[in-house]
């Protein structure tokens, strides 16, 4: 291998992974509340272990939802329906500990600092300050049609396929827990040229042989997903490399909401501000601003203004306007990054209320994002994945570049 060639690896997990169970429960509760009370404040955390689900957090709402029922329905849908799996939707204990949102935080969110200072009218913005300080990143690149890095794109598709072959009884001996990992080789120009390594770990019935699992995973999971032209005789496969994966899910490992933030985003290919998504209503900029940053980055790449783009947004609690906007095109930009920032400011309202309005976020759309990634999804329609501003950005940026 040439010195200039490099390898990059990303991983994904199935919906039955303990941390992902928690993300899905937290977002199922969020969706159920938003369906009845779109203005609710929700920060819902879930923990799972053998036979137990604990739901805690801060929720301020005018509605009632049956949290234990939502938990059991979600666990059942994932596929934990038998005690011998070590976790059963009908028999697991469900504990809840829910408080209201701190009034100190609510005060800052309810009426943004600028509005309190008289710099803005309530008509200009619904006066929502950021629910916390923090920094968020969005990223896009032209490695795939959905403008995502190839390693995480393939890892997600393999993980989703693992669940499909289980639920459709193509491989009925599989159980819900599983992980995937893909290593891509990039050439001297940074273009993906081949798959170096594929790792798949799939929980299974104890009677199935390792040989059958290897054969079936290659045939029914990897082959339909990974493009044949990226595979060669040197591609390495590690399928259940320990030789046995019977004990899994919450019986094998405890799980927590928000512990798969790299899986949820770009697989480590781009930077991450540290904030998790699931269980948070859209006034939490950890979630809404990360979605907005992806929306911005994707439209910049879709416009042809850059091959690769990373957007950073940062906020102060109670303050609506971002304290900073930063754009990095890694030397691939067709115009300067200053011009890109200017056209972004002109075309995207990146105040929390502006983001909520722009992306129509006060809706029950979140549970579907809680497994297999929040970005680059082609199986569901997500507003931050649209490229409706690409042409406008291109026209304005090129006009500014000529001045």
From Swiss-Prot:
Its main location: cytoplasm. The keyword Oxidoreductase does not apply. GO terms for cellular component: cytoplasm. Its cofactor is Mg(2+); K(+). It catalyses: L-methionine + ATP + H2O = S-adenosyl-L-methionine + phosphate + diphosphate. One of its GO terms (molecular function) is ATP binding. It is found in: Cytoplasm. Binds 2 divalent ions per subunit. It is an enzyme of class 2 (transferase). Pathway: Amino-acid biosynthesis; S-adenosyl-L-methionine biosynthesis; S-adenosyl-L-methionine from L-methionine: step 1/1. Mg(2+) binds at residue 19. Keywords: ATP-binding, Cytoplasm, Magnesium, Metal-binding, Nucleotide-binding, One-carbon metabolism, Potassium, Transferase. Its EC number is 2.5.1.6. InterPro entries: ADOMET_SYNTHASE_CS, S-AdoMet_synt_C, S-AdoMet_synt_central, S-AdoMet_synt_N, S-AdoMet_synthetase, S-AdoMet_synthetase_sfam. Residues 101-111 are annotated as: Flexible loop. ATP binds at residues 17, 177-179, 244-245, 253, 259-260, 276, 280. Belongs to the AdoMet synthase family. Catalyzes the formation of S-adenosylmethionine (AdoMet) from methionine and ATP. The overall synthetic reaction is composed of two sequential steps, AdoMet formation and the subsequent tripolyphosphate hydrolysis which occurs prior to release of AdoMet from the enzyme. Homotetramer; dimer of dimers. This is S-adenosylmethionine synthase.
């Amino acid at each position: 291998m040439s010195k200039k060639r490099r390898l990059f690896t990303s991983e994904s997990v199935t919906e039955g992974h303990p941390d992902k169970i928690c993300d899905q429960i937290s977002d199922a509760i969020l969706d159920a509340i938003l369906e009845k009370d779109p203005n609710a404040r929700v920060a819902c955390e879930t923990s799972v272990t053998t036979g137990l689900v604990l739901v805690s957090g801060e929720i301020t709402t005018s509605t009632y939802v049956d949290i234990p029922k939502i938990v059991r329905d979600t666990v059942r849908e994932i596929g934990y329906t038998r005690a011998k799996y070590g976790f059963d939707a009908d028999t697991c204990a469900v504990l809840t500990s829910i408080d209201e949102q701190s009034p100190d935080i609510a005060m800052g969110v309810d009426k943004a600092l600028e509005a309190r200072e008289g710099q803005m009218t309530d008509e200009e913005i619904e006066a929502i300050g950021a629910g916390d300080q923090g920094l968020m990143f969005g990223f896009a690149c032209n490695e795939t049609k959905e403008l995502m890095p190839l390693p995480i794109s393939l890892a997600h598709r393999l993980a989703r396929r693992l669940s499909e072959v289980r639920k459709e009884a193509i491989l009925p001996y599989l159980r819900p827990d599983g992980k995937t990992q893909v290593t891509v080789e990039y050439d001297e120009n940074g273009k993906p040229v081949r798959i170096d390594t594929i790792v798949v770990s799939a929980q299974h019935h104890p009677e199935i042989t390792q040989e059958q699992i290897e054969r079936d995973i290659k045939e029914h999971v990897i082959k339909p997903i990974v493009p044949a032209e990226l595979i060669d005789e040197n591609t390495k496969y590690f399928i259940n490399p320990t030789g046995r994966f019977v004990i899994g899910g919450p019986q094998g490992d405890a799980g927590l909401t928000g512990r798969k933030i790299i899986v949820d985003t770009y697989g480590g290919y781009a930077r991450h501000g540290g904030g998790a998504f699931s269980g948070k209503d859209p006034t939490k900029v950890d979630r809404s601003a990360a979605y907005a940053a992806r929306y911005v980055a994707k439209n910049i790449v879709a416009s042809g203004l850059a091959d690769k783009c990373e957007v950073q947004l940062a906020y102060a609690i109670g303050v609506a306007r971002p304290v900073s906007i930063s754009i990095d095109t890694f030397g691939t930009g067709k115009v300067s990054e200053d011009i890109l920032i200017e056209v972004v400011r002109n075309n995207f309202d990146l105040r929390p209320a502006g983001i909520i309005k722009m992306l129509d976020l006060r809706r029950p759309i979140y549970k579907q994002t809680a497994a297999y990634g929040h970005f680059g999804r082609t199986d569901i329609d997500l507003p931050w994945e649209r490229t409706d501003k690409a042409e406008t950005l291109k026209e304005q940026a090129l006009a500014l570049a000529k001045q």
